[in-house]
């Protein structure tokens, strides 16, 4: 579906902008009728960059992705895989 692609691409773009190894950024998506689960995988060296101090970057990423999904009537969950 087009909306999920937009949300996935948004998360991928944001993550690649934050890390030192953008070639290692991967986003896997799983969807149901109302929810999209996005699993973000980055290089081990970059995990701290996408989580941030006290999880602030991760929280910001989740907020942006959720806002984008809600606009299209879906719920988005971002999981950072280590």
Q: Which residue stretches match the model-derived regions?
A:
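RNA-contacting regions in translation and RNA-metabolism proteins
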Residues: 1-49, 60-82
